């Protein structure tokens, strides 16, 4: 399992280097497409299920607890649930595309693509740290699950009011811009 994870990460490394423009004097953009994204998502979920279940095909005992797996994929999981719930509430197909994902909201707030990436990576890292901490120090699964739901509630509240937050930020930015232009 460790070798598979290592190969998986190494295979994605060139993609990350190109899209973050980390190759000196070269500018490449690689579009993964739906199939690539679905494959990565499927592989990550498969790895989490495989590592969180005892008596799996690869070993006798679980590497991590199921609640830890939730923490490791918290941000994409919460984003997906919120987007699908919003679409269903609007009587749309949950698979209809829209621009209401977390990265769209961050960009509407005026963040650049790189800043948006940093915000999402920071948010995901914080959730992962909580999950790994709970696993490492053997915090009760019921406490970790309750904390996960509390985190989800906070995320849902912020996303639900994202339009108001966006309007407030833009209004505040325009006031600041007007003050700077007219001293």
Q: Residue ranges of each PLM-predicted region?
A:
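Alpha-helical transmembrane segments
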Residues: 1-109, 113-177, 181
């Amino acid at each position: 399992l460790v070798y598979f994870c290592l190969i998986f990460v190494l295979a994605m490394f060139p993609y990350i280097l190109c899209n973050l423009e980390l190759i000196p004097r070269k500018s490449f953009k690689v579009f993964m497409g739906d199939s690539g994204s679905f494959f990565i998502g499927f592989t990550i979920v498969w790895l989490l299920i495989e590592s969180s279940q005892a008596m799996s095909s690869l070993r006798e005992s679980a590497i991590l607890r199921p609640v830890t797996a939730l923490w490791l994929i918290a941000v994409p999981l919460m984003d997906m649930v919120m987007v699908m719930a919003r679409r269903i509430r609007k009587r749309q197909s949950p698979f209809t595309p829209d621009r209401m994902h977390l990265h769209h909201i961050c960009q509407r707030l005026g963040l650049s693509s790189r800043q948006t990436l940093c915000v999402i990576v920071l948010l995901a890292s914080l959730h992962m740290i909580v999950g790994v901490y709970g696993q490492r120090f053997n915090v009760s699964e019921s406490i970790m699950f309750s904390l996960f739901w509390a985190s989800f509630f906070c995320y849902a509240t912020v996303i639900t009011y994202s339009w108001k937050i966006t309007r407030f930020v833009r209004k505040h930015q325009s006031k600041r811009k007007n003050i700077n232009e007219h001293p």
